[in-house]
C-alpha cells in the first residue's frame, strides 16, 4: 500500500516518540500521569502514592504492579499535544527489569531523564544513561520534587555534568523550594511562572510575569532566600552556554527544567521542549541498509512481547515500532524471519491497559500485533523487502533457579506459561539436555517473584524455585561442524536449549567457563544473543 509522500512527511514531522528514564521513586509514574493529563488523555491523574484508593496510576496496569506500586512492564501511551502526536513509552524503574528497558530504548527517538532533586543522580539513572549513550539518544532533563527540600540546584547541575558526562543548559531556574517554592524563572523568555499548591490533578492556567523581581515574591521567599536565588541565577547566566541543537541531537547536551510532577508544575514545559527540540522519527539500521522514516514502504520491528494484557482473552501482544511508511488496517506485510506474508487487520493502539483497534499508523507510532506464538522479540515486518532490523539484544541472565511444580499434573500449563512469559524477554527458560528440568534465568530476584505471581494468577499454576549450581550462561556458535560435534559430546552435561531453540552452555562456575573457552577457541561463547 503506497502512501502519498507529502502526507507521510507531514505525519512524520508531527511525531515525537520518547521514554522516561529514572531511578525508582524519582517520580516517573507520576510524571507519566501528568503528561497524559496535559495531552487530555486522562481527566484526573491517578496518584501513585499510598495506593489505598481504587485509582491506580494509568501506566501501572498489571495486577502485581498495582499491588506493589512499581512499574514492571513497559506501557505504551499515545496522546495529542499542540498539533503533534506524542508516543510515550513508560519503562520499568526497577533494576531487575533493565533488559525490558534496554529494548524499549531501541524504539524511541529521545528520552526524558528525571532526577530526584533531593537525591541527585542515582545508580539506575547512570546505567540507563549508558544505554542512551550507546545510541546517541537526545536527552531532556527534569529535576523533580521542588515542592520538597532539594539540594542546591547548582550542585545538581554540576553532578549531572560530571557523573553523566553531558553538558547542562538550564531552561528554567527554581525560585525557592519545599514550603517556600514560588515557581521557576524561564531563562530565555525572561518570565516567571508561579506555582500554586493543590492543583496537581488538573490543568489550570499558570500565572506568568515578566522578569522575576516582585514584592510578593520577595515576601514569600524572605530577603535572605531571595538574594540567594539572585546570586545563583547570576552565576547560571554567566556560565550559561548557548543551547546547541546539534550537540543535543548527539546526546551530548541536555536542556534542564525544574518542577514538581506531583504538583503538575513544569510538566507542560517538558512537553513544549519535547515538541520544539526533540527529533521526529529517525532512521533505523538493518543488516541490509539504513531505513529512513520518510520511505513510503512500510517497515517496523518488534521490541517487546506482553502476555496476558487482557486475562479474559489469554492473549499475547507484540509491540512493533513503525520505522517507515504507513500501516493501514487489513494490509499485507511480510514476517521476514519466517518468510511469510500475513494480513494484519486487528492491530491495536494503546493507553496503557486500554486498547483500541487501529486504522492507520505512521513512523514513530507503536502498534500492537496479536501474537499466537509466531512472533519473537526482534522480528522485522516489511512490505516485502528482506530487511532485518539490528540492535535488539538478549542478555545472559545472572541468576538461575530450578522450577519445581507443586502439582505434577500441571506440567503442560507450566511449560506454556514459562514459554509465554519468557517470550516477553524479562526471564529466559533453559532446558538442560541431561534431564527434564526447567531452569529459569533472570537478571534480578524480583523477576522470579513476578513469574511465580503471574503463573499463579494467569495460568493457575503454583510452583517454587530452587537454587541451582549455574554461575552463568553463554550462547554457543561454531562454523566447523566437526569441532561443534566434539564440543557437544564433551560438554553434554552442561548443554541446554533456550526458549528460542538455541544451543547454550550452562557454566557451573566462571573458572569452568574460562577453561572451556581456552580448550575450544573455535567455539564462540556469547553473553548476548541478537534477536
From Swiss-Prot:
Protein localization: Cytoplasm
GO MF entries: GTP binding; GTPase activity; guanosine tetraphosphate binding; translation release factor activity, codon nonspecific; translation release factor activity, codon specific
Superkingdom to which the source organism belongs: Bacteria
The UniProt record lists the keyword Cytoplasm: yes
Record InterPro entries: EF-G-like_DII, EFG_III/V, G_TR_CS, P-loop_NTPase, PrfC, RF3_C, RF3_dom_3_sf, RF3_GTP-bd
Domain tr-type G: residue ranges: 13-282
A single cellular component GO annotation: cytosol
One Pfam assignment: EF-G_D2
Chief site of localization: cytoplasm
Nucleotide-binding in keyword set: yes
SUPFAM superfamilies: EF-G C-terminal domain-like, P-loop containing nucleoside triphosphate hydrolases, Translation proteins
List of residues binding GTP: 22-29, 90-94, 144-147
Keyword line: Cytoplasm, GTP-binding, Nucleotide-binding, Protein biosynthesis
Gene Ontology BP annotations: regulation of translational termination
Stated role: Increases the formation of ribosomal termination complexes and stimulates activities of RF-1 and RF-2. It binds guanine nucleotides and has strong preference for UGA stop codons. It may interact directly with the ribosome. The stimulation of RF-1 and RF-2 is significantly reduced by GTP and GDP, but not by GMP.
Protein family per UniProt: Belongs to the TRAFAC class translation factor GTPase superfamily. Classic translation factor GTPase family. PrfC subfamily.
Protein name from the UniProt record: Peptide chain release factor 3
Organism (species): Psychrobacter sp. (strain PRwf-1)
Lineage: Bacteria, Pseudomonadati, Pseudomonadota, Gammaproteobacteria, Moraxellales
Amino acid at each position: 500500500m503506497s502512501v502519498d509522500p507529502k502526507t507521510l512527511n507531514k505525519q512524520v514531522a508531527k511525531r515525537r516518540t520518547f521514554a522516561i528514564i529514572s531511578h525508582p521513586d524519582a517520580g516517573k509514574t507520576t510524571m507519566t500521569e501528568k503528561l497524559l493529563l496535559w495531552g487530555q488523555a486522562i481527566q484526573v491523574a491517578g496518584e501513585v502514592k499510598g495506593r489505598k484508593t481504587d485509582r491506580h496510576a494509568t501506566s501501572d496496569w498489571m495486577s502485581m504492579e498495582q499491588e506493589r506500586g512499581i512499574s514492571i512492564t513497559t506501557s505504551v501511551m499515545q496522546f495529542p499535544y499542540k498539533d503533534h502526536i506524542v508516543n510515550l513509552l513508560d519503562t520499568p524503574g526497577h533494576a531487575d527489569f533493565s533488559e525490558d528497558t534496554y529494548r524499549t530504548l531501541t524504539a524511541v527517538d529521545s528520552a526524558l531523564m528525571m532526577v530526584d532533586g533531593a537525591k541527585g543522580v542515582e545508580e539506575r539513572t547512570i546505567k540507563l544513561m549508558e544505554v542512551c549513550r550507546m545510541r546517541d539518544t537526545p536527552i531532556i532533563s527534569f529535576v523533580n520534587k521542588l515542592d520538597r527540600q532539594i539540594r542546591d540546584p547548582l550542585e545538581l547541575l554540576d553532578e549531572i555534568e560530571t557523573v553523566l558526562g553531558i553538558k547542562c543548559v538550564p531552561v528554567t531556574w527554581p525560585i525557592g523550594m519545599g514550603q517556600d517554592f514560588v515557581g521557576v524563572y524561564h531563562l530565555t523568555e525572561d518570565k516567571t511562572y508561579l506555582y500554586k499548591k493543590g492543583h496537581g490533578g488538573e490543568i489550570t492556567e499558570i500565572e506568568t510575569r515578566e522578569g522575576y523581581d516582585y514584592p510578593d515574591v520577595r515576601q514569600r521567599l524572605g530577603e535572605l532566600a531571595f538574594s540567594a536565588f539572585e546570586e545563583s541565577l547570576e552565576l547560571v547566566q554567566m556560565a550559561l552556554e548557548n543551547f546547541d541543537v546539534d550537540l543535543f541531537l548527539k546526546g551530548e547536551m541536555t536542556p534542564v527544567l525544574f518542577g514538581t510532577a506531583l504538583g503538575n508544575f513544569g510538566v507542560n514545559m517538558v512537553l513544549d521542549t519535547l515538541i520544539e527540540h526533540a527529533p521526529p522519527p529517525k532512521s533505523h539500521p538493518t543488516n541490509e541498509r539504513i531505513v529512513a522514516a520518510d520511505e513510503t514502504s512500510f517497515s517496523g520491528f518488534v521490541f517487546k512481547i506482553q502476555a496476558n494484557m487482557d486475562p479474559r482473552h489469554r492473549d499475547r501482544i507484540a509491540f512493533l515500532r513503525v520505522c517507515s511508511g504507513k500501516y493501514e488496517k487489513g494490509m499485507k506485510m511480510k514476517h521476514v524471519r519466517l518468510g511469510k506474508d500475513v494480513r494484519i487487520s486487528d492491530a491495536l493502539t494503546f493507553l496503557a491497559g486500554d486498547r483500541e483497534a487501529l486504522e492507520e499508523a505512521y513512523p514513530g507510532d507503536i502498534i500492537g500485533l496479536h501474537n499466537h506464538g509466531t512472533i519473537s522479540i526482534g522480528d522485522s515486518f516489511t512490505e516485502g523487502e528482506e530487511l532485518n532490523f539490528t540492535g535488539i539484544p538478549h542478555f545472559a541472565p545472572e541468576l538461575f533457579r530450578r522450577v519445581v511444580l507443586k502439582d505434577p499434573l500441571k506440567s503442560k500449563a507450566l511449560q506454556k506459561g514459562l514459554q509465554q512469559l519468557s517470550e516477553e524477554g524479562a526471564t529466559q527458560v533453559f532446558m538442560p539436555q541431561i534431564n527434564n528440568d526447567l531452569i529459569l534465568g533472570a537478571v534480578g530476584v524480583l523477576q522470579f517473584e513476578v513469574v511465580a505471581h503471574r503463573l499463579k494468577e494467569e495460568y493457575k499454576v503454583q510452583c517454587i524455585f530452587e537454587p541451582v549450581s549455574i554461575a552463568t550462561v553463554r550462547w554457543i556458535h561454531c562454523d566447523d561442524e566437526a569441532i561443534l560435534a566434539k564440543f557437544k559430546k564433551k560438554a553434554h552435561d552442561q548443554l541446554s536449549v533456550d526458549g528460542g531453540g538455541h544451543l547454550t552452555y550452562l557454566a557451573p562456575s566462571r573458572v569452568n567457563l574460562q577453561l572451556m573457552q581456552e580448550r575450544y577457541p573455535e567455539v564462540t561463547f556469547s553473553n548476548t544473543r541478537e534477536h
